[in-house]
Amino acid sequence: MRFLAFSLMTILSVDHALGADGLEPLRYNHPGLVVDLGVGLWAWPLPTDVDNDGDFDLIVSCPDKPSNGVWLFENATGDTRQNAMPVFKPARLLSKTQKYVMPSYVDGKMRTLSPGVEYKNFETKGIEERVTLPVDPNFHKPLGKQPKGPKVRHNQWRYVDYDGNQALDLVVAVEDWSYYGWDDAWDATGKWVNGPLHGWIYRLRNEGTTQTPKYAAPEFLQVGESRLEVFGCPSPNFEDFDGDGDLDLICGEFLDKFTYFENVGTRSKPRYAPGSRLLSMDGSELAMDLEMIVPVAFDWDRDGDFDLIVGDEDGRVAFVENTGFRSTKDPKIPVFAKPKYFQQQADTLKCGALATPFGFDWDGDGDMDLLSGNTAGYIEYFENLSGSGVEAPKWNRPERLEVDGKVFRIMAGPNGSIQGPAEAKWGYTTLCVADWDHDSLPDIVLNSILGRVVWLKNIGTRTAPKLAKPQPIDVEWNGESPRLAWGWERPKGKELLTQWRTTPYVHDFNGDGLLDLSMLDSEGYLAFFERAKIGDHSIVKHPRRAFLDESNRPLQLNSGAAGKSGRRKLCFVDWDRDGKLDLLLNSANADFFKQVDTMKGNWILKNAGTLAKKNIEGHDVSPTVVDFDGNGIPDFLGGAEDGRLYYMRNPLSLP
């Protein structure tokens, strides 16, 4: 187990301990390295030639925290006709941003909208110059009766001359959650009993002119006698995809696929056929790696047809090429190549979104590497190329860890998330590296969106780790295995099924030479799962709520239910070097729970406040500790919503 062992020093005062305020994202420090292009959480792409140099650049709006902004990636390679996969320069911030910023391409120029607003000079000013449109941005009134949830999320506005009368109309795509609700709507068999997500599209006919618009009342687009619909987040793209002179429609969705609606009417009187899934060249359904996709139709490779530039939830953006071929099932449906994710010159380390880093010398070469989970459900490995004793290491691009020769990934699937089928492509991996089976090789202990705690045994060597398939963490329960008070999942055998998206932390807490486990139990209390030896093998004992506050009450780190449960990221370390194990817990950065006493095998912890003043919290911040400079003092590293890893020296390391 990697646990920083620190000798006793003069006890640092809490005031001093909380005085440092760094929190700077780790940088690759690796000239010439190329990595996936990425903003923070949620990528809304706006391809255009920003600098009028004849090649296409990429603007990406990112409404997350702490990377909120309109970000410009300049094409440093050249004409996308010759090279459709340029290497972009690191992003430059144009402005802050709002949600749901989308481009419209009118007479060879880009016009940019968000709900109820158009932005002038967007390519250079971002959202600084606003013009209000004469339409209520919240005109859609949800009618579903589900009490939970946001009612409406995605609200996408675009210009299009829908009927070819030379006056730009408005199309507005809405994502209605009022029938879906939010969470905990599974029956005992794992069937979702609430409604689906609805992705609908309105047309607001312009009865005036493009220069002086007068918009009619919104009307839903139809397919026959029914509303045209996809599973949330339609991202509508009206272009002539089949070359017959009228405007067809390609939509995205909240999940990962695309739907094509052929215009079987005319340019002036559109009429849409039932939707068909877009296919890739091998005949499989065209799909992105993640979900919450945002496609924008754009002739990126300048070959005369419309490709798709698609943003993913984790901040990446992909080129999805229109091959020019047609489906063998229907010659009207265009066929696209599989997504290729754009690349950029390496700048700051990024592990998807909601990164959950852990510092450990994974390759056994004497320096501290990083492993991290993310929303997509991968475990990514960042190799330290500098050696020990370097505070700002040179990093390699991340590798996704494999099991049995295939990239390891946890996903919820159709019914694995307490928040419903809309979360099928998410995994929310959070991990700890430790020698769980005491064979002198580091293993991985893992929790995820599923709440089933597993470990991946290292069957390789110390310098060349290799992981076996996940195995459950079995517990010797006192009686029946505890179940969660929500959801349809039940523990299998002795396995540990607990609250989702919360860190398992492995350490020899009681000093008996066996590695124990601490994490949230099924009711949100921080529990101690002690290991014990039975013959020649070890067991995990029934948990105790052994971590107490100053009033000797067990620490309940989350009292929420269902989707509000779990979500706590934590790390144990002797942060203040007083010889006692402290707790770092996710907050605006991380709260420092100082160990002040022990009592009858319990640990008494006092919340001494956040480590830093700077707030980098979106969904949460996942804390770990590192010692890149090799001085024996643990420094802070926090994985944020934007997928970046924020570093701060321990105040004890400050000059």
Give the label of every model feature segment.
Residues L18-P655:
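Beta-propeller-forming repeat regions
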Residues F3-S13:
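Sec-dependent N-terminal signal peptides
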